Design a protein with these regions (language model features):
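C-terminal catalytic histidine-bearing segment of alpha/beta-hydrolase fold enzymes
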Residues: 218, 234, 241-287
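Active-site-adjacent alpha-helix of alpha/beta-hydrolase-fold enzymes
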Residues: 188-197, 219-249
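Short, proline-enriched alpha-helix->beta-strand connector loops that line the catalytic pocket
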Residues: 165-169, 209-215, 243-246
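Short substrate-entry loop that stabilizes the transition state in hydrolases
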Residues: 63-65, 71-104, 226
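Primarily recognizes the serine-hydrolase "nucleophile elbow" in alpha/beta-hydrolase
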Residues: 124-185
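Catalytic nucleophile-loop/oxyanion-hole region of alpha/beta-hydrolase
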Residues: 42-45, 80, 95-133
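Mobile cap/lid helix-loop segments that gate and shape the active-site cleft of serine hydrolases
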Residues: 37-38, 173-207
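N-terminal cap/lid segment of alpha/beta-hydrolase-fold proteins
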Residues: 25-61
């Protein structure tokens, strides 16, 4: 690793530079960037300031590249930001977010709001790193997949920052809960059975529409995947298609359980970003 200065207008960002795999070129990494807007930082708690940070990895020597904003899993109660193994020509923004607290100090809305702020930061700043703001994708695993859908499907979220869901190039949730997340429910005092599906304003299924960015929902395969997870995601995609969405894919990774859905699903995220996802996986496509 070595220090690298990248001049962006009047600013100089000091990045950590590493060499990627052969033929892939070099990437520059900058870590722990605060992503909350200045007005939010004024009233932010110490915990929020600690968690609301992101890492950026970009290809060196090229411009106009696509970017994936990646949200980690962990049931909204654990986990930490990390990069995924995709083509080095695709930039990544790996973001932390606040985790649910039993005392109610952090709610499901707070988790989603943090994720939204990270995506809005990326839309506003990726051009400074050489990326194309029209090629910003959002993806995440499990709880991160849930956040991906909530940020990219509920128009009120990005609307707070002057953006629309269609300002995103695409959504690629991996094994995200399409109904209301079970821990969002539990931490709010809901004692109903975990697998009783609930659809309200905190459920991605409530926002199915034709007016969404391209979306691929990636899951493991029943019966190995988390109960109901693949089925509810297929319903989400099928509902979007029935409402007129023309670029919606559903992928069930053969024999993959919930954990293996990550390693099996990331290659599909890469294909999606590169525009190489097989049309045969698109629901509603003619066979």
């Amino acid at each position: 690793m070595k220090a690298f200065g990248l001049k962006l207008g009047r600013a100089v960002l000091v990045l950590s530079l590493g060499v990627a795999s052969a033929g892939a070129g070099e990437t520059a990494v900058r870590r722990d960037i605060p992503y909350l807007p200045d007005e939010a930082l004024v009233s932010a708690s110490a915990y929020q300031r600690e968690r609301c940070r992101l890492d950026v990895r970009v290809p060196v020597g090229v411009t106009g590249f696509p970017t994936v904003v990646w949200f980690h899993g962990g049931g909204l109660t654990g986990g930490s930001k990390h990069f995924i193994r995709i083509d080095e020509g695709i930039a990544q923004v790996a973001a932390n977010y606040r985790l649910l607290q039993k005392d109610g100090s952090v709610t499901g809305d707070d988790c989603i709001d943090d994720a939204t702020a990270a995506v809005a930061w990326t839309l506003r700043n990726v051009a400074k790193f050489g990326g194309d703001p029209k090629k910003v994708y959002v993806s995440g695993m499990s709880a991160g997949g849930y956040l991906t859908m909530m940020v990219g499907m509920d128009p009120s979220r990005l609307g707070k920052y002057g953006f629309r869901p269609t300002d995103l190039a695409g959504l690629a949730p991996i094994s995200g809960q399409a109904t209301k997340h079970f821990n969002v429910r539990a931490f709010a005092g809901d004692v109903d059975p975990q697998y009783l599906p609930k659809i309200d304003r905190l459920a991605p299924l409530a926002y199915c529409s034709k007016d969404l960015p391209p979306i691929v929902s990636i899951c493991g395969e029943p019966p190995w995947e988390w109960p109901c997870r693949a089925e509810e995601n297929r319903l989400l995609i099928a509902s979007c298609v029935a409402l007129g969405h023309e670029k919606a894919w559903f992928v069930s990774c053969p024999y993959a359980d919930h954990g293996r859905a990550l390693t099996a699903g990331v290659p599909y995220v890469e294909l999606f970003v590169q525009g190489r996802l097989p049309d045969s996986l698109r629901l509603g496509a003619r066979r």
